[in-house]
Amino acid sequence: MREIVHIQAGQCGNQIGAKFWEVISDEHGVDPTGAYHGDSDLQLERINVYYNEATGGRYVPRAILMDLEPGTMDSVRAGPYGQIFRPDNFVFGQTGAGNNWAKGHYTEGAELIDSVLDVVRKEAESCDCLQGFQIAHSLGGGTGSGMGTLLISKIREEYPDRMMMTFSVFPSPKVSDTVVEPYNATLSVHQLVENADEVMCIDNEALYDICFRTLKLTTPTFGDLNHLVSIVMSGVTCCLRFPGQLNSDLRKLAVNLIPFPRLHFFLIGFAPLTSRGSQQYRALTVPELTQQMFDAKNMMAASDPRHGRYLTASAMFRGRMSTKEVDEQMLNVQNKNSSYFVEWIPNNIKSSVCDIPPRGLKMAATFIGNSTAIQEMFKRVSEQFTAMFRRKAFLHWYTGEGMDEMEFTEAESNMNDLVSEYQQYQDATAEEEGEFDENEGAEGEEQPADY
């Protein structure tokens, strides 16, 4: 019941995905060969959310791995859980997208997409009641961004009523991996606004800061960063996989978090994050988890929630705790920091409690917030985009693959619209009545306000 099909695209997506399957397999007691060596029936009760049961009791991930070059997949295959995946579910090309969104979306990616969709169909058909898809990819490269968004739009056509959740790695503010990141990211966001249901925004720099500042790792590797992402990915779906007192699933999450359809880009966080040596010196309590969870330093994307306001938020607790205490803490957060929550959505934190904590912890919490501060991220990318696009720098790489400049202009204005929508709701108060009419043009000046 309620299966989720997992797709990882491009180098970044495959590396995050590989880490994610290590975390999930560990939680469910599945070893690298797919055999079950767990210690509790609860691990098996709803293992089919993420796994197919094959012959001989092997558990095989419902995962589809795609890339336009074989390199990363070979390293996934050689990694600790490489043998657990179904060999037919590796779909790769030989050419690479060369950090070019157009190659991933229109030329190279378009050639490979049908074979990916065949695998998606096969996985979806083996589901009892498919809940939705989760996609791990980055927005700065070529494959994850270009081909990833192509796949999302194709799946959207074929499964319009299924949830589409993405874990999208945005370009970092100070660290740039490729020069054309702003182009690729803007073109991708243009797609995600229209076709995804929930986008969890991640960025490497914020992850580095967490590793460095909170976990006290002197030289964080991508493996460390990806581990952070994967515990959040696991936390988001723990309610589907383990029994809980207050459940949530992808659809409940969306209904509670998305007040306006376009504003579905979320900040994510996790608690407790402690350095390896200091764990035994603190007892975990719900208040402590709540405090750390809402801490700006804990956000996995480089935007500071203190610069905006929360439209909505969701807190998913794991472990044995009283729901009363959870409710009290949530109320407490909203009362103490009321200026950081919009007042026109009362009680805007959804909480859920799942009984089984992650391995090695007594309790943990996953945080998902819909904050207007996320506009900082889009603004930053948009500024870099405009700087290059004004001079038409690097554009020939894209037009050479058959793209039109028009598409860039559209993507740019779509992203700027998104920023101003966030800003509009950040400034809004409960009193302005005429403001939120469907026709955004009528900004409340035309019709007389009836107070």
From Swiss-Prot:
Swiss-Prot/TrEMBL cofactor(s): Mg(2+)
Matches recorded under CDD domains: beta_tubulin (cd02187)
Span of the signal peptide: none
GO biological process, one term: microtubule-based process
Record GO terms (molecular function): GTP binding; GTPase activity; metal ion binding; structural constituent of cytoskeleton
Annotated localization: Cytoplasm, Cytoskeleton
Keyword Mitochondrion: no
Entries under PROSITE patterns matching the protein: TUBULIN, TUBULIN_B_AUTOREG
Binding annotation for Mg(2+): E69
Source taxon at top rank: Eukaryota
UniProt binding sites for GTP: Q11, E69, S138, G142, T143, G144, N204, N226
Keywords per UniProt: Cytoplasm, Cytoskeleton, GTP-binding, Magnesium, Metal-binding, Microtubule, Nucleotide-binding
GO cellular component: cytoplasm; microtubule
Role summary: Tubulin is the major constituent of microtubules, a cylinder consisting of laterally associated linear protofilaments composed of alpha- and beta-tubulin heterodimers. Microtubules grow by the addition of GTP-tubulin dimers to the microtubule end, where a stabilizing cap forms. Below the cap, tubulin dimers are in GDP-bound state, owing to GTPase activity of alpha-tubulin.
Family: Belongs to the tubulin family.
The protein's assembly and partners: Dimer of alpha and beta chains. A typical microtubule is a hollow water-filled tube with an outer diameter of 25 nm and an inner diameter of 15 nM. Alpha-beta heterodimers associate head-to-tail to form protofilaments running lengthwise along the microtubule wall with the beta-tubulin subunit facing the microtubule plus end conferring a structural polarity. Microtubules usually have 13 protofilaments but different protofilament numbers can be found in some organisms and specialized cells.
Protein name: Tubulin beta chain
UniProt source species: Naegleria pringsheimi
